[in-house]
Amino acid sequence: MTSRILQRFFTVSTSLRSLTRAEVPGEKIDAKRARLLYQSKKRGILENDILLGDFAEQNLKKMSEPELKAYDKLINGEHMEWDLFYYLSNKKSPPEDVESCQVYQKVKKFVDDKRVPKS
């Protein structure tokens, strides 16, 4: 009984995760932009909600399909939420695959430009 419940839980949670966190095959570009905007604003930690949400609002409409795919991989890929925040806020150095990503560089520049200078 317990193993059936656990199996059902993992099946449902895996299905839901694939719908909300991964690229959807055959997804139209407008639907992808809408999904990424939502996912950028609802990250799970307020810091990323603000940083990524603001970036997405201002930039997703201008991004090409390959850029959207790279952004999707950046925010929904293997990196933990706090790690993304630490990379963007200069608290941790990003790994080479993140640092070399042009979309990450755009997000990083956006975040750096928003930073309030210390007096």
Swiss-Prot record:
Superkingdom of this protein's organism:
Eukaryota
Does Transport show up as a keyword for this record? no
User: Keyword Acetylation on this protein?
Assistant: no
Recorded GO CC terms = mitochondrial matrix; mitochondrion
Q: Give compartment(s).
A: Mitochondrion matrix
Tell me its family: Belongs to the SDHAF2 family.
Q: What is this protein called?
A: Succinate dehydrogenase assembly factor 2, mitochondrial
Q: Which organism is it from?
A: Caenorhabditis elegans
